[in-house]
A protein has these predicted regions:
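Glycosyltransferase donor-sugar binding loop
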Residues: 45, 184-185, 216, 239-255, ...
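Membrane-proximal helix-turn-helix segments that form the acceptor-binding/catalytic region
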Residues: 139-157
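An aromatic- and histidine-rich active-site surface loop
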Residues: 72-84, 93-126, 298
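Conserved acidic donor-binding segment of nucleotide-sugar-dependent glycosyltransferases
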Residues: 329-337, 344-350
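Conserved donor-binding/catalytic core segment of Leloir-type glycosyltransferases
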Residues: 5, 199-223, 229-236, 242
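A short, active-site helix/loop in glycosyltransferases that binds the activated sugar's phosphate group
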Residues: 152-189, 376
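N-terminal strand-loop element at the rim of the active site
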Residues: 7-15, 29-68, 163-171, 248-252
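Acidic donor-binding loop of glycosyltransferase active sites
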Residues: 282-298, 311-312
Length: 384
């Protein structure tokens, strides 16, 4: 039996972002009976208690509330508890898979302990976290140093994007790397235009099928909301811009409003978050075009979902995005007027089925969870 300890996500069941969804899908689509997953779960109330989720052994870690440093303490406590389990249960050849770079600067001592019990350390750097503008300069410097420490000391660095793997290879030549993509759900929405749920939602926001452009994603500056909204407002389209994000109570919302005055354009509609997956898929499938502005990171889950559900995708042209969407999308830059011109061009057209078919073919070939989980299981069972 190969035991894999997964550390660095908030845990299961998945309720948050990319890492949590990845872990959920990894255990949900488990194919081999020779694998046993142990998943750290951040808790505010319980410590070192166990529960089972989709066959995985989940354990809670009650990390002290230290502000941004809490995640570092969480990872440290989780690793120590996993080491304790390995010793008590006499587990041989365990794999410790750490997601993210937060603990990186302190990884050296843990590498020795992991190797001392016959274990291997695999890490996933989570894109270029240190480049995110939400971090202060000191935090960015720490994250860059943490990335360096983990890349140079891990037994294997797993990247979910070819661009990230290339960056790791170029930046840290001694690092051993492996590319395994992120996955996505390809299931089409079961809802139809006649369903009451759809009509209620569309009437609430005064929307019509194919009558809107769409943005979905974390509400942070590096996702280029300012450029996308400013350029949309410059365009001549009569369609709306629907923005699905966590803007409520976010200071960036007021900053963005002051910079762009989007509240003066009735086409721009911030509609909050949508947690109903079936509804979100319908909204994606019936948008005229999806605008993807993510600039930092690896394979973005939102881009994969767009390629799987939307025919026309207008994507910010960085290497990370191009390596995924390839020729199935149109690309834009931050140059003034570039995206507005692209919107004006596509707005006059109507048939983008060929692009959509190409995008879905890319997803089916390279990004289904079944394929991704199969690659991870092959790695876990044979790499060490």
């Amino acid at each position: 039996m190969q035991h894999v300890f997964i550390i660095g996500s908030r845990g299961l069941p998945a309720q948050y972002g990319g890492f949590e969804t990845f872990v959920e899908e990894l255990v949900k689509h488990q194919q081999s009976s020779n694998l046993k997953y142990h998943v750290a779960c951040l808790s505010n109330t319980e410590h070192e208690t166990h529960f089972e989720h989709l066959g995985a052994d989940c354990f809670t870690i009650k990390a002290p509330k230290l502000g941004p440093a809490r995640v570092i303490a969480y990872d440290m406590m989780a690793i120590n508890y996993c080491l304790k389990m390995v010793k008590e249960q006499r587990i041989s050849n365990p794999i410790f898979y750490i997601l993210g770079n937060t603990i990186g600067a302190f990884i050296g001592g843990f590498v020795k302990k992991i190797h001392a019990v016959g274990g291997h350390l695999f890490v996933n750097p989570d894109g270029l976290e240190w480049k995110r503008s939400k971090w202060s300069k000191p935090v960015q410097a720490y994250l860059k140093y943490a990335e360096k420490c983990k890349a140079n000391q891990a037994d294997l660095v797993i990247s979910d994007n070819i661009g990230i793997e290339t960056y790791i290879k170029n930046s840290y030549p001694t690092a051993k790397t492996r590319f395994i993509a992120y996955g996505t759900d390809t299931q089409v929405s079961s809802l139809t235009a006649k369903d009451q749920k759809i009509r209620t939602y569309f009437e609430k926001w005064d929307l019509t099928e194919k009558g809107y452009y769409l943005i979905v994603g974390r509400f942070v500056p590096e996702n280029n909301y300012e450029t996308a909204i400013r350029e949309f407002m410059l365009s001549e389209t009569k369609r709306d811009l629907v923005v699905i994000c966590n803007h409520e109570g976010n200071a960036y919302f007021d900053t963005l409003r002051a910079k762009t005055q989007f509240d003066m354009d009735e086409r721009v509609k911030f509609v909050g978050t949508v947690y109903d997956r079936d509804l979100l898929n319908y909204v994606r499938e019936n948008t005229f075009a999806y605008i993807h502005g993510h600039e930092v990171g690896g394979t973005n889950p939102g881009l994969l979902e767009a390629l799987g559900h939307t025919d026309l995708n207008l994507v910010f042209g960085v290497d990370f995005n191009k390596s995924v969407a390839q020729s199935s999308a149109y690309y834009w830059t931050k140059e003034a007027g570039n995206l507005a011109s692209l919107i004006n061009d596509v707005d006059k057209q109507s048939d983008f089925k060929a692009l959509g078919e190409q995008a879905r073919a890319i997803i089916k070939e390279s990004y289904t969870w079944e394929k991704i989980v199969g690659e991870y299981e092959e790695l876990f069972l044979h790499e060490n």
